[in-house]
Swiss-Prot record:
InterPro entries (UniProt xref): IGPD_sf (IPR038494), ImidazoleglycerolP_deHydtase (IPR000807), ImidazoleglycerP_deHydtase_CS (IPR020565), Ribosomal_Su5_D2-typ_SF (IPR020568)
EC number: 4.2.1.19
GO process terms (BP): L-histidine biosynthetic process
Pfam families documented for this protein: IGPD (PF00475)
Gene Ontology terms for molecular function: imidazoleglycerol-phosphate dehydratase activity
Family: Belongs to the imidazoleglycerol-phosphate dehydratase family.
Known catalytic reactions: D-erythro-1-(imidazol-4-yl)glycerol 3-phosphate = 3-(imidazol-4-yl)-2-oxopropyl phosphate + H2O
Alphabetic keyword roster: Amino-acid biosynthesis, Histidine biosynthesis, Lyase
Region feature (Disordered): 23-55
Pathway this chain belongs to: Amino-acid biosynthesis; L-histidine biosynthesis; L-histidine from 5-phospho-alpha-D-ribose 1-diphosphate: step 6/9
Gene: HIS3
Protein's name according to its UniProt entry: Imidazoleglycerol-phosphate dehydratase
Length: 226
């Protein structure tokens, strides 16, 4: 199995994003040079980051959108990834470009780190509760990008993240990662809980889908998943 690591940089007129990822956790190198070392007057990484370092994982997320940081942190933690995300976006406009582009960049990093779709289970599913909320996620590492997201969110915003951008982040991730993704919140009345349980369920599903199936075969009747 490959090292399952990747570094991705996505630079547009709207956002600057750098990502380092290890799908198996462990030590991870921070992108160099850091965006926050070179951008004066931009969003500055600090104690409000979604950061966590343990013996098995390093996670440091700074998108400039607090609730988005929180969701990506939950995804990385429960998927078993080490993940560093740095983003400087045009938040003076709104949160759309930052959220969408972070989803795209994370999907690209995931795809690159996974490498050839060979010797993995391919399919994964997961349930995750958070108090009264319960979500289900089903993943197919298929090279057939599609996302069906039903979270049933009622609020306009959670913190500084527009609720309409939460499913859009997942759609952007699935498109760039080239996976088929179904995520549903089955019940719950607190939109924070509904969203977080969805990201945790996705983490469980991805962790299963990319786990070894004990062979070196391509898990497809076609013989290819490119």
């Amino acid at each position: 199995m490959t090292s399952r690591t990747a570094q991705v940089s996505r630079i547009t007129n709207e956002t600057k994003i750098q990502i380092s990822i290890s799908l198996t956790g462990g030590p991870i190198e921070r992108p160099q040079p850091s965006l926050f070392a070179s951008e004066k007057g931009a969003n500055t990484a600090g104690p409000d980051d979604a950061s966590q370092t343990t013996a098995s994982q390093t996670i440091d997320i700074h998108t400039g959108v607090g609730f988005l940081d929180h969701m990506i942190h939950a995804l990385a933690k429960h998927a078993g990834w080490s993940l560093i995300v740095e983003c400087i976006g045009d938040l003076h406009i709104d949160d759309h470009h930052t959220t969408e582009d972070c989803g795209i960049a994370l999907g690209e990093a995931f795809k690159e780190a996974l490498g050839a779709v060979r010797g993995i289970k391919r399919f994964g599913s997961g349930f995750a509760p958070l108090d009264e909320a319960l979500s289900r996620a089903v993943v197919d590492i298929s090279n057939r990008p599609l996302a069906v997201i039903e979270l049933g969110l009622k609020r306009e915003r959670i913190g500084d993240l527009s609720c309409e951008m939460i499913p859009h982040f997942l759609e952007s991730f699935a498109e760039a990662a080239r996976i088929t993704l179904h995520v549903d919140c089955l019940r719950g009345f607190n939109d924070h809980h509904r969203s977080e349980s969805a990201f945790k369920a996705l983490a469980v599903a991805i962790r299963e889908a990319i786990s070894s199936n004990g062979t070196n075969d391509v898990p497809s009747t076609k013989g290819v998943l490119m």
